[in-house]
């Protein structure tokens, strides 16, 4: 019998250990992973903070409930109910644990922010409090208020439950004897049992109600009631006034309730509660009446100061309050010499577009079906001594395409992508395809940019774990009929010892970790390999850019992710996409082989990122620590620029009257990607150019604005990204009395030009044939003029065809030209026609007709043969002849 008990005890212990291990696997794995990356303190910050808060809050809640229970003890027959003491202690432990766990796990981060708040040095216009109060402190105070209110309500319910449990036996006897339930008797018994306690709790509840309205009054700065976001005329003059009355009445009411319960008087309690209830109801009704009958008919006058607050604080919150504004008068007086003076800008004009280039990369540079290019990034590199804009993309593994898709293939053999594809943005091949500088597998590199190890273990598509240093060699890249193999030479990974095999088998619910003979003690597992998820795992409080970009530095591959601090608690700031404050305050840099990840602060003027750095002391590094070779490739990100542009559509207006009237509303310019398609928002282009009145070329991010519901451009916003001017925004305002073509309007101009439209019609053969596509529209400011650039793509028939650049359209002033290359188009655009001798027009026309017939026949033959390069060449010649004939 004793032996059976021992066996049973051991079995229970083993079962509990397995259950504990199962629950603990995620924690153990995460701890090892953070330890590997030297971020143990970041990981343990949450754990220890929750632990401290749980212990403290558990003790406070347990003691409060127990003292409350002991205060009821005087009215309990303790000898009769002494056996319930252990039950009450257990019940108190459970309740206190639940409250403590809820509080510590949900609000640990708010408490850290509260304790590590950093002033904004900007005060709100209503309560004169620093913005940091609203960002860091008010949310926590609100959470504490809700928690305490719940505990107080629980105490009332707890009292009633305790009363009925203790007196249940007597009450059942009474009901059986009298056949009725004496409500008055119960009421008096409750008063005798816990009258004083309920008086105190009820009074505290009312006291906290007054505190709740103090918090609610502060939240008026987020009111959506008026014309704008933030406290309006009605909020300040009516709602705030009534809130203050409720605060005073609730405070007085708490005293009245306490005294009345002690004296067993119900009437004063009812009067107090009814008065508070009526005040709460009156706030909504009174505010609505004032808004309808007073404010709406005098809106502009009454709301003007509050609109002023909204304009000022929205511009501050989205960092558009310090934009340099320049009046850009369009003179259209460029000469060929001006073009020569801006040669570097002209040479770097992008004639390749993102989507067609990515499509071409995936068709011709993946090499095998199991490779994929996720997206294309634009960057600038000094190539062979010359500053150049390029497209670059990582060749990553597409694990879904691996055949056979076995566990070994997915996790042990196919572990990494290989290399990059890089092409020039300013040129194409004779066929109109991207002009590659780095391509193929193994890498063919025509630049002086070296990549010693092109393997990509950490990327945008590396969503699964990989086990390296196994008995199986890793697939490196295809080489003819055979495959090149390799072995991981990085330093990352968690050792796969027996304990870790068990932990991962439990965590991943996969016995292969234990059964595979290929995984040895020397093997390591790489987890959290998706670079964005990797960053989120370490710093989930940051918001990450949708488009990480790849950088070649020191002969290695690195990923750069832009990280943002955001909030929806900035007073008076108009929300956009659920936020009303944003800063690009950090850059995350990840090694593509080792997975080493570093967070760098790039904006020390952002109080939120400074607060984060105080909370997580070992997480962030200073901007100066970023390697110089990577600094050269930092870009102002599109995500924040798009948000700023969206806000700027309305908030470029700083005059309240103009703002209220909507006199000068803008919208981001629309564009058209294919012939006769719907409009879509124009993508903001990165361009390498010299800003007007500046001496040096640099990478700029441009946004084009139209007048609202019109296709004429009103302005252009430029974001700079050199180290000295990083993030500086410049707005070029165009004259309102001139018609400035927007990207969409420019497309219509192209289609309305008789010569170009004829040629495009010949290209656009029709259903079942080739299709014409527009590229990205680039509008380049040069001196006091605008040069429009548009690439024309031709897509051949067939699902595997990729669009190819077949023409460049340039426009300046009223002139528009189409040619096969940028140089030819520029020559045609800026070279004046020389006066020639008179010719026999009739003879020339006859000869031209004959020549046109010959070229037309050749073009049709090339079309049938699928030789689109020759077809384009013949069509161009035919167009030139037709152009000559109509002169």
UniProtKB/Swiss-Prot annotation:
Question: Quick one: where is this thing mainly located?
Answer: membrane
The regions listed as transmembrane in this protein's record are 9-29, 47-67, 87-107, 146-166, 195-215, 242-262, 266-286
The Gene Ontology CC terms held by the record are: extracellular region; plasma membrane
Name the Pfam families for this protein: UPF0182
Is Cell membrane tagged as a keyword?
A: yes
Enumerate the UniProt keywords alphabetically.
Cell membrane, Membrane, Transmembrane, Transmembrane helix
The membrane topology of this protein is: Multi-pass membrane protein
Q: Where is this protein localized, as stated in its record? A: Cell membrane
Q: InterPro entries, from UniProt?
A: UPF0182
UniProt record similarity statement: Belongs to the UPF0182 family.
Protein name stated in the entry: UPF0182 protein CTC_00086
Please give the organism: Clostridium tetani (strain Massachusetts / E88)
């Amino acid at each position: 019998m004793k032996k059976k008990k021992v066996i049973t005890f051991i079995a229970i212990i083993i079962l509990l250990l397995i259950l504990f291990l199962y629950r603990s696997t995620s924690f153990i794995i995460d701890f090892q992973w953070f330890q590997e990356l030297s971020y143990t303190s970041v990981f343990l910050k949450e754990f220890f903070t929750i632990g401290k808060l749980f212990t403290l809050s558990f003790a406070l809640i347990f003691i409060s409930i127990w003292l409350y229970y002991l205060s009821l003890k005087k009215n309990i027959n303790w000898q009769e109910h002494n056996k319930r003491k252990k039950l009450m202690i257990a019940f108190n432990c459970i309740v206190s644990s639940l409250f403590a766990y809820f509080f510590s796990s949900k609000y640990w981060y708010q408490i850290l922010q509260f304790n590590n708040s950093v002033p904004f040095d900007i005060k709100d216009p209503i309560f004169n409090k620093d913005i940091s109060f609203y960002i860091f402190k008010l949310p926590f105070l609100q959470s504490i208020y809700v928690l305490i209110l719940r505990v107080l309500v629980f105490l009332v319910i707890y009292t009633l439950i305790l009363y009925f449990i203790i007196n249940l036996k007597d009450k059942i006897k009474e009901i059986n004897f009298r056949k009725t339930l004496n409500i008055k008797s119960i009421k008096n018994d409750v008063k005798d049992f816990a009258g004083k306690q309920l008086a105190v709790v009820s009074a505290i509840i009312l006291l906290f109600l007054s505190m709740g309205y103090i918090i609610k009054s502060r939240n008026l700065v987020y009111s959506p009631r008026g014309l704008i976001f933030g406290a309006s005329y009605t909020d300040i003059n009516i709602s705030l006034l009534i809130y203050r009355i409720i605060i005073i009445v609730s405070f007085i009411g708490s005293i009245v309730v306490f005294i009345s319960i002690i004296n067993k008087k119900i009437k004063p309690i009812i009067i107090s509660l009814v008065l508070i209830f009526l005040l709460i109801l009156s706030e909504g009704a009174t505010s609505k009446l004032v808004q309808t009958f007073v404010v709406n008919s005098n809106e502009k006058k009454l709301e003007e100061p509050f609109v002023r607050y909204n304009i000022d604080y929205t511009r501050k919150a989205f960092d558009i309050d310090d934009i340099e504004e320049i009046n850009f008068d369009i003179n259209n007086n460029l000469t060929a010499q001006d073009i020569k003076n801006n040669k570097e800008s002209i040479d770097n004009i992008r004639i390749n577009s993102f989507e067609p280039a990515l499509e071409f990369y995936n068709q011709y540079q993946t090499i095998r079906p199991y490779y994929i290019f996720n997206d294309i990034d634009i960057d600038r590199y000094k190539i062979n001594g010359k500053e150049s804009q390029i497209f670059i993309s990582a060749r990553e593994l597409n694990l879904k395409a691996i055949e056979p898709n076995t566990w070994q293939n997915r996790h042990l053999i196919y572990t990494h992508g290989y290399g990059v594809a890089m092409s020039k943005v300013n040129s194409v091949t004779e066929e109109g395809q991207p002009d590659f500088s780095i391509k193929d597998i193994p890498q063919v590199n025509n630049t002086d940019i070296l990549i010693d190890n092109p393997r990509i273990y950490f990327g945008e598509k590396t969503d699964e774990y990989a086990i390296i240093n196994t008995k199986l060699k890793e697939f490196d890249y295809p080489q003819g009929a055979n495959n090149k193999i390799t072995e991981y030479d990085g330093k990352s990974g968690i050792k796969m010892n027996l304990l870790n095999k068990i932990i991962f088998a439990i965590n991943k619910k996969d016995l292969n970790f234990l059964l595979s003979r290929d995984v040895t003690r020397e093997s390591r597992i790489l987890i959290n390999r998706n670079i964005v998820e990797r960053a989120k795992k370490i710093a989930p409080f940051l918001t990450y850019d949708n488009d990480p970009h790849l950088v070649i530095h020191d002969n290695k591959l690195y990923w750069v992710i832009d990280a943002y601090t955001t909030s929806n608690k900035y007073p008076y700031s108009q929300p956009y996409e659920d936020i009303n404050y944003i800063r690009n305050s950090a850059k995350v840099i990840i090694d593509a082989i080792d997975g080493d990840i570093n967070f760098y602060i790039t904006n020390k003027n952002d109080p939120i990122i400074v607060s984060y750095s105080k909370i997580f002391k070992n997480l962030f590094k200073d901007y100066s620590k970023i390697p110089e070779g990577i600094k050269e490739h930092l870009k102002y990100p599109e995500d924040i620029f798009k948000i700023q542009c969206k806000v700027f559509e309305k908030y470029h207006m700083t005059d309240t009257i103009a703002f209220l009237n909507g006199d000068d509303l803008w919208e981001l310019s629309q564009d058209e990607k294919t012939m006769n398609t719907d409009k879509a928002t124009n993508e903001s282009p990165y361009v390498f150019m010299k800003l007007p009145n500046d001496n040096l070329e640099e990478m700029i991010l441009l946004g084009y604005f139209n007048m609202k519901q019109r296709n004429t451009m009103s302005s252009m916003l430029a974001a700079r990204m050199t180290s000295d001017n990083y993030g500086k925004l410049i707005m070029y305002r165009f004259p309102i009395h001139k018609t400035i073509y927007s990207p969409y309007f420019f497309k219509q101009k192209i289609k309305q030009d008789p010569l170009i439209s004829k040629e495009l019609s010949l290209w656009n053969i029709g259903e079942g044939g080739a299709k014409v596509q527009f590229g990205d529209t680039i509008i380049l400011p040069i001196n006091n003029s605008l040069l429009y650039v548009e690439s024309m793509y031709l897509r051949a028939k067939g699902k595997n065809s990729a669009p190819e650049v077949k023409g460049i359209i340039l426009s300046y002033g009223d002139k528009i030209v189409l040619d096969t290359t940028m140089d030819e188009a520029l020559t045609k655009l800026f070279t004046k026609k020389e006066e020639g001798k008179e010719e026999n027009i009739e003879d020339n026309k006859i000869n031209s007709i004959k020549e046109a017939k010959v070229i037309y026949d050749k073009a049709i033959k090339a079309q049938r043969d699928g030789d689109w390069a020759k077809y384009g060449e013949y069509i161009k010649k035919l167009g030139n002849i037709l152009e000559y004939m109509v002169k």
